[in-house]
Amino acid sequence: MMAATVVSRIRTGTGRAPVMWLSLSLVAVAAAVATEQQVPLVLWSSDRNLWAPVADTHEGHITSDMQLSTYLDPALELGPRNVLLFLQDKLSIEDFTAYGGVFGNKQDSAFSNLENALDLAPSSLVLPAVDWYAISTLTTYLQEKLGASPLHVDLATLKELKLNASLPALLLIRLPYTASSGLMAPREVLTGNDEVIGQVLSTLKSEDVPYTAALTAVRPSRVARDITMVAGGLGRQLLQTQVASPAIHPPVSYNDTAPRILFWAQNFSVAYKDEWKDLTSLTFGVENLNLTGSFWNDSFAMLSLTYEPLFGATVTFKFILASRFYPVSARYWFAMERLEIHSNGSVAHFNVSQVTGPSIYSFHCEYVSSVSKKGNLLVTNVPSVWQMTLHNFQIQAFNVTGEQFSYASDCAGFFSPGIWMGLLTTLFMLFIFTYGLHMILSLKTMDRFDDHKGPTITLTQIV
């Protein structure tokens, strides 16, 4: 109810900016009980009455992808055809509380332009906690609804564009300063991003272009406490320490003029002659990762990762993928043709033909490994001294939009161990029910005065 009041107050345009930021600080309580996989989403438009009251936005509520689509559909179908997506690297609802003008202290607010835009917008919507999966597919969803490919723009490019109110346009604006945010204070990063938002909106206002804008982030900037600590576990034991959540590293991205290949894994380990090494920290989140040899086109892609020294030599891993059109399904499908490991002039080949899916999707699998206990998706024709295991593996080499994966085609089969267990349990219970019903229907009532073996009893009527 609290968050619904916030959204309603902003939407009608009667609430002032200080009230909005004070309300956002209260909504931050809802995000405190969520996990680290939620980010806020702020929407506003130059048209009126695009969003109905949000009845489900209460403390602790997390907006799913299906609920988000119900909020976005009216704006995309009835609102302006020009959509702006401001995408930050990190953002959490707590940032609005910590760095916004919550109590009227507007001179210290890091969101002055955003605050002004929401205050003047005829329609606006604030969702404090949106599921990370819904945000990761937001660009693809907007592209499908608008029927327009996303266009990565900056301030210089935006001034040269001639936007038309009748033609759909999806403008993706990656806010700057994110690459060097580790060297800057959070307030400076947010202030710089807010200035970019203000300049973009000023450009659209000068051209009198109707628009719908959205501000969100790739991942949260703050790790929220677990719900058990907030709701029911406030009493801590003596000498108890809070376990730190593992950091979520960004995917490896190969770029030429734009991001072309995305690769991610929760754990990336290789073994040479049964000596295992973890390459996760050497691969993800590393600025100087050696991608020499990688290339991409519409039908063929190769991601090349080089490490030196590794096992005393220079080792290169090559993920080779191809995209082909299949008339039967009338769509393009991609497949990873092979995985190569180059070292000391020798090459080890792994067949990974099961890594496949529609080209508009990414591929995800819990384990892609040469170890038989973990699925054995990496197959070699001859015995090899190399072994590899990728945990929570995900890759996309075609139709990449920004640095976010599209919907994932998962490797999980239908008859998984859990499904088999459920089916067998259901069949067993059904057998017991059928047998019991059969026994009940087979019951016959016995007349204790009826003796089928003896003579029939006859009664003579005496008058």
UniProtKB/Swiss-Prot annotation:
N-glycosylated. It is a single-pass type I membrane protein. Expressed in brain cortex (at protein level). Highly expressed in islets of Langerhans. Expressed in pancreatic acini, pituitary gland, adrenal gland, lung, brain and bone marrow. Keywords: Cytoplasmic vesicle, Disulfide bond, Endoplasmic reticulum, Glycoprotein, Hydrogen ion transport, Ion transport, Membrane, Signal, Synapse, Transmembrane, Transmembrane helix, Transport. This is V-type proton ATPase subunit S1. The record marks R225, D226 as: Cleavage. Accessory component of the multisubunit proton-transporting vacuolar (V)-ATPase protein pump. Interacts (via N-terminus) with ATP6AP2 (via N-terminus). Interacts with RNASEK. Interacts with TMEM106B (via C-terminus). Residues 434-463 are cytoplasmic. It is found in: Endoplasmic reticulum membrane; Endoplasmic reticulum-Golgi intermediate compartment membrane; Cytoplasmic vesicle, Secretory vesicle, Synaptic vesicle membrane; Cytoplasmic vesicle, Clathrin-coated vesicle membrane. Accessory subunit of the proton-transporting vacuolar (V)-ATPase protein pump, which is required for luminal acidification of secretory vesicles. Guides the V-type ATPase into specialized subcellular compartments, such as neuroendocrine regulated secretory vesicles or the ruffled border of the osteoclast, thereby regulating its activity. Involved in membrane trafficking and Ca(2+)-dependent membrane fusion. May play a role in the assembly of the V-type ATPase complex. One of its GO terms (cellular component) is endoplasmic reticulum-Golgi intermediate compartment membrane. PANTHER family: V-TYPE PROTON ATPASE SUBUNIT S1 (PTHR12471:SF2), VACUOLAR ATP SYNTHASE SUBUNIT S1 (PTHR12471). Belongs to the vacuolar ATPase subunit S1 family. Residues 33-225 form a propeptide. GO terms for molecular function: ATPase activator activity; small GTPase binding; transporter activator activity. It comes from Mus musculus (Mouse). Residues 1-32 form the signal peptide. Its main location: endoplasmic reticulum. InterPro entries: Ac45_acc_su, VAS1/VOA1_TM, VAS1_LD. One of its GO terms (biological process) is synaptic vesicle lumen acidification.
